Amino acid sequence: MNEVIILGREQFINKVLPKVDEVKNTFFISILEPDDDFENLHEDTENFKTWKFYDIEYDINNYKAITFEQAKEIYEFIKKNEGKNLICHCYAGVARSGAVGEFYWEMLGG
């Protein structure tokens, strides 16, 4: 049985990030705010990928929601890693990462 773990950013940074390169049969999705002070938490690899978009449904002035292209990239990354465990985080560990985790869980037959 595959695990889908959803975390907030601080939990991810403190508990998961130091062990990312050691974990087997797992892939990681990092969702950051576009104006975060850091570029990425980890370099993108076959098992780790970062996207940046705000937790909003549609663009509001300079605040950008997820784009169709980003959604497609996330889907393709998930398909490439299908069958592995997923650890996904966003700032609070609720909406964006929760939606990605729910999608993967349903894809696996949830």
Give each language-model segment a name:
Residues 1-37:
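Cys-based phosphatase fold recognition centered on the PTP superfamily
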Residues 27-29, 47-51:
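Hydrophobic/aromatic beta-strand patches that form the interior of the parallel beta-sheet core
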Residues 32, 54, 91:
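Anionic group-transfer/hydrolysis microenvironments
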Residues 37-39, 59, 95-99:
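Short catalytic/ligand-binding loop motif for oxyanion handling, primarily in non-cytosolic enzymes
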Residues 41-43:
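Non-transmembrane, aqueous-exposed alpha-helical and coiled segments at domain scale
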Residues 49-87:
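Helix-loop module immediately N-terminal to the HCX5R catalytic loop
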Residues 78-108:
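Catalytic cysteine-centered active loop of the rhodanese-like fold, especially the PTP/DSP P-loop
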